[in-house]
Amino acid sequence: MTIKVIVVGAGGNLGHHIVSALDDDHRFTVTILARASSKSKFPSHITVHRVDDYYPELEVVEAFKGQDVVISTVTTGAIQRQKTLIDAALKAGVGRFIPSEFGHDTRNGNASKMLPQMYQQKREVVEYLRAKQNDGLEWTAFVTGPFLEVAIENFLGFNLSQQHATILNEGSDRWSATTRATVGLAVKNSLLIPEKTSNRYLFIDTVTASQNDVLLALRKMTGTEWGVDYVDAEEQKRVAIEHLSKGRLIGIPMLMRYITCVRGYGGDYLDYETSANEILSLPVRNVDEVIASILKG
């Protein structure tokens, strides 16, 4: 018997990697729930249910009927709408809900205070799921750190085209990150061992490294020296908060770099939580190998 999974937000930054991992495994039947206005293209053999952009409960319940698992990969702007999806999953008789938690450890109070619109709202969704688990809806939340191949140039401080790095403090604090393909594999494998992954957070990574480790790998893989600016992390945080106070969104990636790369804000989650890599059969990779694959595209 196949496991029936419906993915919400499959056209986004992460969704198609999860769909691909599931679709490549004959043990799963994949369906997609998409917004009516979505322009995303999906494989022709996958059933797509389109609903109003605000996810009306009646429409969503109908789409969820017969599904074993709902996986949500909705964007930050739709995080709170997951409560409607959760209620619909319960009414449709779905067995498990995986929320769009993928990223930093949102339980960290320091990070939530800094970017509540990203972290606090995600945590509230998991708490909503906790309250529903006695009603028969299991959940699994993934802490992955940033998606490495996206974040490395986006906000982690490495300009690949100019071969220049911006390093916070001495660059020695270690943090964890995961590639999107590994996230997809982790989600798929978690559904194959439901008794070990029910009603809990799963902490995974592709690499755990410091900014200095990444810089060393980039120098090695490109064969060039790279320019470096070492900057004060607290000053960067102050500037980022000032940007946000004036409505400048550039402050968000600056704070995400701080949260990731400065100890105590949850980027170092594998220092205080047990890795789920082994139970999820995730591949072991070193920093050089991962950076080389990112540079190859």
UniProtKB/Swiss-Prot annotation:
Gene3D superfamilies: NAD(P)-binding Rossmann-like Domain, UDP-galactose 4-epimerase, domain 1. It holds the Pfam family NmrA. Keywords: NADP, Oxidoreductase. SUPFAM superfamilies: NAD(P)-binding Rossmann-fold domains (SSF51735). The keyword NADP applies. One of its GO terms (molecular function) is oxidoreductase activity. Pathway: Secondary metabolite biosynthesis. InterPro entries: NAD(P)-bd_dom_sf, NmrA-like, NmrA/Isoflavone_reductase-like, PCBER-like. It is an enzyme of class 1 (oxidoreductase). Its EC number is 1.3.1.-. Belongs to the NmrA-type oxidoreductase family. Isoflavone reductase subfamily. Oxidoreductase; part of the gene cluster that mediates the biosynthesis of the asperipin-2a, a bicyclic peptide that possesses two macrocyclic ether rings consisting of 14- and 17-membered paracyclophans. The pathway starts with the processing of the precursor aprA by kexin proteases to produce 11 identical copies of the hexapeptide Phe-Tyr-Tyr-Thr-Gly-Tyr. Macrocyclization of asperipin-2a may accompany an alpha-hydroxylation-dehydration sequence to give an imine, which is readily hydrolyzed to yield putative ketone intermediate. This is Oxidoreductase aprR. It comes from Aspergillus flavus (strain ATCC 200026 / FGSC A1120 / IAM 13836 / NRRL 3357 / JCM 12722 / SRRC 167). The gene is aprR.
